[in-house]
Amino acid sequence: MNHIKWLSDLKKAGLLALGKGVITLLKRFSLVIVTLMMSIVVVLAAAKESPGDHVISFDEPIILMISIGIVVFLLIPPLVMSFFGNLVVRIISGVYQCFIVFTFLGLIPIGFLIPNGFLTILVSIAGTLVSIASVAVTLCIGKNKKDI
């Protein structure tokens, strides 16, 4: 209960004044960050269970790092767009994130082709759910009546 008391004291003092817009921004930003982390985890899971020579594996760390770098690079646009609350930017970000959802959905059947690919399937399903939540939050949270 002490931690709640000092939080309320900070709020009364005016030091903790997070507006509705900041909370909305944090929701969008945090879900995009979680999507980024799920993307990195699915690359690592696929590398762990790689069946052949011409796939991502821990045996070739440079290629693995390049793959993770590409994933991070491709998720920078929705990460940057999560800072903006403009309706047009949110729609563009939502459409971009839909491609990420389709990528995670495409990894689910690929996980069945990998021997012992249960971890890849599990992470892909979790990534799909997080990405769908991110799209929903991006498009629905923070709507104003003047935006409609």
Swiss-Prot record:
The keyword Transmembrane helix appears for this protein:
yes
Keywords associated with the record: Cell membrane, Membrane, Transmembrane, Transmembrane helix
Which residues span the membrane?
A: 29-49, 61-81, 99-119, 121-141
Q: Write down what this protein is called.
A: Uncharacterized membrane protein YdeH
Extract the signal peptide range: none
Name where it mostly resides. Answer: membrane
Q: Name one GO cellular component term.
A: plasma membrane
Where does this one sit in the cell?
A: Cell membrane
Gene source species? Bacillus subtilis (strain 168)
What is this protein's gene name?
ydeH
Q: How does it sit in the membrane?
A: Multi-pass membrane protein
